[in-house]
UniProtKB/Swiss-Prot annotation:
Keywords: Cell inner membrane, Cell membrane, Membrane, Transmembrane, Transmembrane helix. This is Inner membrane-spanning protein YciB. The chain crosses the membrane at residues 48-68, 73-93, 102-122, 147-167, 170-190. Plays a role in cell envelope biogenesis, maintenance of cell envelope integrity and membrane homeostasis. It is found in: Cell inner membrane. NCBIfam families: PRK00259.1-3. Its main location: membrane. It comes from Nitrosococcus oceani (strain ATCC 19707 / BCRC 17464 / JCM 30415 / NCIMB 11848 / C-107). The keyword Membrane applies. The keyword Transmembrane applies.
Length: 204
């Protein structure tokens, strides 16, 4: 359930992009009331603009719902909201999808930078802070895991740019949801297999 909630803006972005050409013209015309959103009914190049506007609204809703339920903000949601508002807003203002295409890369690289900073400047790397209640590992292994996450975020950001510039917009939209999710799941599963060797029998 939490995974779905975290992916909520991305899922709506994908759905809005795919369904844009099926929207009735009068609904598309009515969307012009949204600031910087000027759409032409049936124009395929406008699908990314519509999807970007939906993603901005979904991110605002995500942060609001999380705060309403937990009475606090989650850092990942705030970072995503800030970037989608800035880069998504630039996409709508300049009618240029380049800005929103950079968002996944910037998000990944910011997280990678945070993991790197935690390893260089704090006593415990971020991955240890997040997982130490579930498993006990030597410091060297925590550092190795943290380094693996840094590499993962770097590679994910580069992969997003490669798909964004080497393939069509439609391919990138699919990759943004399914490709990035697939990469993350593969990495997490690989990490789980790696960690099994450090589990004590009592922890199984």
């Amino acid at each position: 359930m939490k995974l779905f909630f975290d992916l909520f803006p991305i899922i709506l972005f994908f759905a809005a992009y795919q369904l844009y050409d099926q929207l009735p013209p009068d609904i598309v015309a009515g969307l012009d009331r949204i600031p910087f959103l000027v759409l032409i009914p049936g124009a395929p190049e406008n699908a990314i603009l519509f999807a970007t506007a939906i993603a901005i609204l979904a991110s605002v809703l995500q942060v609001g719902l999380y705060f309403f339920k937990h009475h606090r903000f989650e850092s990942m949601h705030l970072v995503t909201l800030g970037l989608v508002v800035v880069l998504g807003g630039a996409t709508l203002m300049f009618r240029d999808p380049t800005f929103i295409k950079w968002k996944p890369t910037v998000v990944n690289w910011l997280f990678g930078l945070a993991f790197l900073a935690s390893q260089l400047f704090t006593r415990k790397p971020l991955v240890q802070r997040m997982m130490s209640t579930a498993i006990t590992l030597p410091t060297s292994i925590w550092n190795r895991l943290n380094g693996a996450w840094i590499i993962f975020f770097l590679v994910s950001g580069l992969a997003n740019l490669y798909v964004a510039y080497a393939f069509t917009e439609a391919v990138w939209v699919n990759f943004k949801l399914f490709g990035m999710l697939g990469l993350t799941l593969l990495f997490v599963v690989g990490q789980a297999f790696y960690l099994t060797r450090y589990l004590n029998p009592s922890e199984d």
